[in-house]
């Protein structure tokens, strides 16, 4: 008498063994049309399966939150099946699901093209129209091995040999006569896999080992219905339009080249943005009483060994030799700041010391992970290190939080998420010290009326931390700011101060970053604004365009007037149609376009329009300059409306 328990908490008792179809008819017959899978004791089962003992059953229809991944697992192996249909000699290595989609890695004699993606997608659609059932079979290790050996699928044989014990069963899924290793629960029938799109081709080493063969990876996305697929494709199109790499190239902000991977060649316009952002942070540093320092790019490897960075990060550290001495190209600023702190004796009266640097850091990131300004090998950290007593920690944390929000408020991100990472299993320091430190951080967040999420066990081994995550208008999260307590580094590098009892005491270090990396933050801003940066950050703030040659003298006069008050301005005297000029400078994301013709020249006024197409009409020059200067000085995120 099997007792069947259901996901909703109900149960049903049967007097004899019963098929899944019969259970469905008794429990929920209406679900049959939308049922994509059934899980019995957390394992996929066919509809004709008979249940002979107690079981836990879950019906998965298209509305179930698990449906999406089940469809994506199915599409991943549908893609493998399509590949084998078109290119029988191609070797399927692995397939799996990822966020928003799926992929398949293949070993093929030639490079796969965009045209091939269309061919494969059409083949997948043809297979879906057959509405075949997907079968799951458990077979022996030797049977599974033999199946893939006969098909010359060496990668599948390798996966079986390495991951499955010779006495174990192997779970295979069958798409018609095509067998593949079970990677996850799949749909009953391929008809539920209609809504997919193949997207791009990439490269990946077998088992992520650069000593192995490079495979070709085909990426796709899949959804439960057409509306969700279309919505996702629209989202991807919007991402492509906002891609900082494309916008950066079009606006001539920077470039990167093969001879210096992960390093940025800043052009004049991009460097203006960089410096404006850096100067803005400098204003805040002064306001919050930081001292700016500069530490060497090269520091003896011995320091990095003493600090512990060499043991933990040596694979990411560039090194160089000089006169039989090995140096590290700094991957971070903190050990250098400790050297400045240690350079002279400190009293408790000197603390807190807030030390900031725009440090040029280098990290040997894998070439495959490099991505425009977002992931580079050379970047500028806007971090700071606060050396303070234990009693000063709460006050300093509070000021750090205020400074971070003060600066972020200028950029009007959709939301700021806050996470508090607590003690990991492996850590230094006593439980009482961790209790006190975690309470310091949480109390300061609460005092500032900030909601936050705990990340249990995610803190560094040397102290808890707060992360500030910026959410953009496309709901993407960017982790930028951090406040990190550190009890470890000052101990490792022998830092101390003299307290009021004339005793040596080890200071606490607070690591504080706001933008994180200036380069990455510029990339985030470009994508958030689609290149339409606020006026104060725009490389060119105003362009004056002439209608005819008659007004060229007045254009030059205006150019000087704006330049004299440090407004970044260009003039366009080309003999082109006015509509052409306006469109060109709008595409260049220049905030304000001033139009000068005979009417403007004779009245000594200007016609103004912004890059959104709003026409202000003809206005007084000095009035406009005054309004523009106010917009720039206040670092207004939005343009003037009148």
UniProtKB/Swiss-Prot annotation:
It comes from the Bacteria. It catalyses: tRNA(Thr) + L-threonine + ATP = L-threonyl-tRNA(Thr) + AMP + diphosphate + H(+). Binds 1 zinc ion per subunit. The keyword Ligase applies. Pfam families: HGTP_anticodon, tRNA-synt_2b, tRNA_SAD. SMART domains: tRNA_SAD. One of its GO terms (molecular function) is threonine-tRNA ligase activity. Keywords: Aminoacyl-tRNA synthetase, ATP-binding, Cytoplasm, Ligase, Metal-binding, Nucleotide-binding, Protein biosynthesis, RNA-binding, tRNA-binding, Zinc. Zn(2+) binds at residues 334, 385, 511. One of its GO terms (biological process) is threonyl-tRNA aminoacylation. Residues 243-534 are annotated as: Catalytic. InterPro entries: aa-tRNA-synt_IIb, aa-tRNA-synth_II, aa-tRNA-synth_II/BPL/LPL, Anticodon-bd, Anticodon-bd_dom_sf, Beta-grasp_dom_sf, TGS, Thr-tRNA-ligase_IIa. SUPFAM superfamilies: Class II aaRS ABD-related, Class II aaRS and biotin synthetases, ThrRS/AlaRS common domain. PROSITE patterns: AA_TRNA_LIGASE_II, TGS. Its cofactor is Zn(2+). The keyword Lipoprotein does not apply. Its EC number is 6.1.1.3. It is found in: Cytoplasm. GO terms for cellular component: cytosol. Homodimer. Belongs to the class-II aminoacyl-tRNA synthetase family. This is Threonine--tRNA ligase. It comes from Buchnera aphidicola subsp. Acyrthosiphon pisum (strain Tuc7). The gene is thrS.
């Amino acid at each position: 008498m099997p007792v069947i328990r259901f996901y909703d908490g109900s149960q049903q008792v049967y007097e004899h063994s019963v098929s899944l179809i019969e259970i469905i008819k008794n429990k929920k017959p209406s679900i049959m049309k939308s049922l994509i899978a059934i899980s019995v004791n957390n394992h996929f089962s066919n509809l004709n399966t008979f249940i002979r003992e107690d079981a836990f059953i879950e019906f998965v229809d298209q509305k179930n939150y698990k449906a999406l991944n089940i469809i994506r697992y199915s599409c991943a192996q549908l893609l493998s099946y399509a590949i084998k249909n078109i290119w029988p000699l191609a070797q399927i290595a692995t397939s799996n699901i990822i966020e928003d989609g799926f992929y398949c890695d293949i070993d093929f004699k030639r490079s796969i093209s965009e045209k091939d993606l269309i061919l494969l997608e059409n083949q997948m659609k043809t297979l879906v129209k057959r509405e075949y059932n997907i079968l799951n079979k458990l077979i022996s290790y030797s049977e599974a091995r033999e199946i893939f050996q006969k098909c010359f699928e060496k990668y599948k044989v390798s996966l079986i040999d390495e991951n499955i014990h010779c006495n174990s069963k192997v779970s295979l899924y069958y798409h018609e006569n095509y067998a593949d290793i079970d990677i996850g629960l799949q749909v009953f029938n391929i008809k539920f896999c209609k809504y997919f799109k193949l997207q791009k081709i990439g490269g990946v080493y077998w088992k992520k080992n650069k000593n192995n063969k490079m495979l070709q990876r085909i990426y796709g996305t899949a959804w439960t219905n057409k509306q969700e697929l279309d919505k996702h494709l629209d989202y991807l199109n919007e991402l492509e339009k906002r891609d900082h790499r494309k916008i950066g190239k079009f606006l001539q902000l920077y470039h990167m080249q093969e001879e210096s991977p992960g390093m940025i060649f800043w052009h004049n316009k991009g460097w203006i943005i960089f410096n404006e952002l850096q100067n803005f942070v400098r204003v805040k540093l002064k306001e919050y009483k930081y001292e700016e320092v500069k530490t060497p790019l090269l520091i003896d490897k011995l320091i990095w060994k003493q600090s512990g960075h060499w043991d933990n990060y040596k694979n990411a550290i560039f090194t160089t030799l000089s006169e039989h001495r090995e140096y590290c190209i700094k991957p971070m600023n903190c050990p250098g700041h400790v050297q400045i702190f240690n350079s002279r004796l400190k009293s408790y009266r000197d603390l807190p010391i807030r030390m900031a640097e725009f440090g040029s850091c280098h990290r040997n990131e894998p070439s495959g992970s490099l991505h425009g300004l977002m992931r580079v090998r050379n970047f500028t950290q806007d971090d700071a290190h606060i050396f303070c007593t234990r009693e000063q920690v709460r006050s300093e944390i509070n000021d750090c939080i205020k400074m971070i929000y003060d600066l972020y408020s200028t950029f009007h991100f959709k939301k700021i998420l806050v996470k508090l990472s607590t003690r990991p299993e492996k850590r230094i320091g006593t439980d009482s010290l961790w209790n006190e430190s975690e309470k310091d951080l949480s109390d300061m967040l609460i005092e500032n009326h900030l909601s936050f999420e705990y990340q249990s066990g995610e803190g560094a081994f040397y102290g808890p931390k707060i992360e500030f995550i910026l959410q953009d208008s496309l709901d993407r999260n960017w982790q930028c700011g951090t406040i990190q307590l550190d009890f470890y580094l000052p101990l490792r590098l022998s830092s101390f101060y003299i307290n009021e009892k004339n005793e040596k005491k080890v200071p606490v270090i607070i690591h504080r970053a706001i933008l994180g990396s200036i380069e990455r933050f510029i990339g985030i801003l470009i994508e958030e604004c689609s290149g339409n940066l606020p006026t104060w950050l725009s490389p060119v703030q105003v362009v004056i365009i002439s209608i005819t040659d008659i007004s060229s003298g007045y254009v030059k006069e205006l150019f000087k007037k704006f330049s004299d008050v440090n407004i970044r301005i260009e003039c366009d005297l080309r003999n082109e149609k006015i509509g052409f000029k306006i469109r060109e400078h709008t595409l260049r994301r220049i905030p304000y376009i001033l139009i000068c013709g005979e009417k403007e020249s004779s009245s000594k006024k200007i016609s103004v329009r912004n890059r959104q197409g709003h026409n202000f009409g003809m206005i007084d020059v000095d009035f406009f300059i005054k309004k523009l200067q106010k917009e720039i000085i206040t670092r207004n995120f939005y343009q003037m409306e009148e």
